[in-house]
Regions:
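Long protein-protein interaction modules used by eukaryotic assembly/scaffold proteins
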Residues: 5-6
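Acidic, proline/glycine-rich low-complexity IDRs
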Residues: 98-170
């Protein structure tokens, strides 16, 4: 499974666009994965990179990478990132995404991915945003398949929060 960071020409989406004008926008996509994985990673992980870290304007991705490394080194137990798109609960093993506006609901259930996948995606997004905005710019990173089994609906950090979220499971 891989993530592709690139730019696309969106000029054709504008009615007043002339044939020689070029309007580009970044695009993130999951490739070499099943439809279910593409959908879930796209809906949560890639959406969070797009909505919460647009262009790394204030070095937000650099700051986040330092927090992730602090969690990995056990300098801090976990880190909660409150942002516009998602609240992200970062622990040593996984990152849980909760929609910042809708919370936990049928359209936006909690979702988690391995910390390794999250860190790779965040580092790649930072590197991508540092590159020139061009249709030739592309970054592709591979997410380790061996970590897929760690994806869980209720990782340890969520069990602690389950009562406050009024979640029920068997």
């Amino acid at each position: 499974m891989k993530i592709r960071f690139s730019y696309r020409d969106i000029s054709k989406n504008f009615k007043n666009s002339t044939s020689d004008s070029l309007e580009i926008r970044h695009a993130f996509e999951i490739i070499d994965a099943t439809e279910q994985i593409r959908k879930s990673y796209g809906q949560y992980l890639l959406s969070s990179l797009d909505s919460d870290f647009y262009e790394n304007r204030f070095n937000d991705l650099d700051i986040l990478i330092k927090k992730i490394e602090s969690v990995e080194k056990r300098e801090i137990k976990d880190y909660i990132l409150h942002s516009g798109g998602f609240t992200q609960y970062i622990s040593r093993y996984s990152v849980v995404f909760e929609h910042a506006i809708f919370g936990v609901c049928p359209h936006w259930p909690l979702w988690a991915c391995p910390l390794s996948h999250y860190k790779i995606a965040v580092e790649a997004a930072r590197d991508f945003f540092a590159m020139p905005e061009s249709l030739d710019t592309e970054v592709i990173v591979e997410l380790p398949e061996s970590d897929m089994a760690q994806i869980a609906l209720f990782p340890p950090i969520m069990i602690e929060r389950e009562e406050s979220l009024d979640l029920k499971h068997d």
